[in-house]
Design a protein with these regions (language model features):
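Generic structural signal for well-ordered alpha-helical scaffold segments
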Residues: 3-4, 88-96
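Generic beta-sheet signal
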Residues: 11, 101-109
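Active-site-proximal alpha-helix that buttresses catalytic centers in soluble enzyme cores
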Residues: 1-32
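Short, active-site-adjacent cap segments at secondary-structure transitions
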Residues: 20-22, 42-43, 111-114
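Short beta-strand scaffold positions
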Residues: 15-16, 85, 106-107
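Domain-level recognition of soluble alpha/beta enzyme cores
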Residues: 122-146
Length: 151
């Protein structure tokens, strides 16, 4: 479904280090190299990583994490606030290298949600729920972000 999708051209592409994002970047921008940005990786879910809801639903630590909407970190993992600080730092680092032009970020849903919530604070984190393969075209003027459209 992503291969052949018509996207605006990008002067530079940045991707999470995880394989699924690197593969997606290659599908979306087949003739362009991309730069891997370590801090664009998804949230570290610690002890919950690679487990399903069914496997975790009776775990009190998991229930507490769900009840707080991820505000407390999973055991051995990263809090939503820590992820937001990390990903927003990476975003500002990438943006600071570009005074003009178009960049593309091929990253995870939680990474997108953290960046968009931070830069468009009229909508909270879960308002930016990102499905697989979705994206936003945004304009950045150095101070604020304007969403032009989503797909």
């Amino acid at each position: 479904a992503l291969a052949g999708r018509q996207l605006p051209p990008a002067n530079q592409i940045y991707a999470s280090p995880l394989l699924r994002c690197r593969e997606t970047a290659s599908l979306l921008f087949p003739s362009q190299p991309f730069e891997v940005v370590e801090d664009f990786r998804e949230c570290d879910f610690g002890a919950f990583e690679n487990h399903t809801y069914e496997e975790l639903k009776d775990d009190p630590a998991y229930q507490l994490w769900l009840d707080t909407a991820g505000e407390i970190p999973p055991p051995g993992g990263e809090s939503k606030a820590a992820q937001k600080i990390r990903t927003l730092g990476a975003f500002h680092s990438v943006i600071s290298r570009h005074s003009a032009g178009t960049i593309a970020l091929v990253v995870h849903g939680g990474t997108i949600m953290a960046i968009l919530e931070s830069l468009e604070p009229t909508h909270e984190f879960y308002r930016w729920q990102a499905e697989n393969g979705c994206g936003w075209l945004c304009a950045w003027d150095g101070r604020s972000l304007t969403v032009i459209f989503s797909y």
